[in-house]
């Protein structure tokens, strides 16, 4: 009986955490740290970004904006569901771009990249914010980061973690709804 009580307390703590503003704030801070790392590699270490890297940055900025807005909005089930849905789309987009970059880097992919971002004229972020979104290199390899992982591998791991965090929040939302109904 004691194990069930302990498990229930742990589940409640995890659920409360995943439904809190702190969760969204943490996701926003992690996203900002990832962007700061990319800019450090670009401007301090001289590692210029390619088309796929910039597309990954766009997904990351989308995720960061969703997380920031969700941290500021009232915590209602509807808004939480919409926010989690948007965050999931951004995180999955980031995983896809990371996987594509990983494949290119390791000679597994069947693709390449260009010196243009490839966005329509009405969404010319590379012209509006060239310091953040201008393509300056062709895809080939990404620099090494911590633990001998390449930037593509690190990004793939981080993006997968983001997807799991959002899925956890969605599960927590469903869990609280099911608990309230019973």
Predicted regions, residues:
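Short, charged juxtamembrane terminal tails flanking transmembrane helices
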Residues: 3, 12, 176-182
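Structural signal for the C-terminal ends of transmembrane alpha-helices
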Residues: 68-76, 164-174
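Short, Lys/Arg-rich, polar N-terminal cytosolic tail immediately upstream
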Residues: 2-19
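C-terminal TM-helix exit segments that contain a strictly Trp-centered aromatic cap at the helix terminus
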Residues: 33-42, 92-108, 125
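Extracytosolic (periplasmic/ER-lumenal) interhelical loops and adjacent juxtamembrane/interface segments
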Residues: 105-152
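Membrane-interface loop-to-helix entry segments
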Residues: 52-62, 129-133, 146-161
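Interfacial segments of alpha-helical transmembrane regions
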Residues: 16-29, 75-95, 164
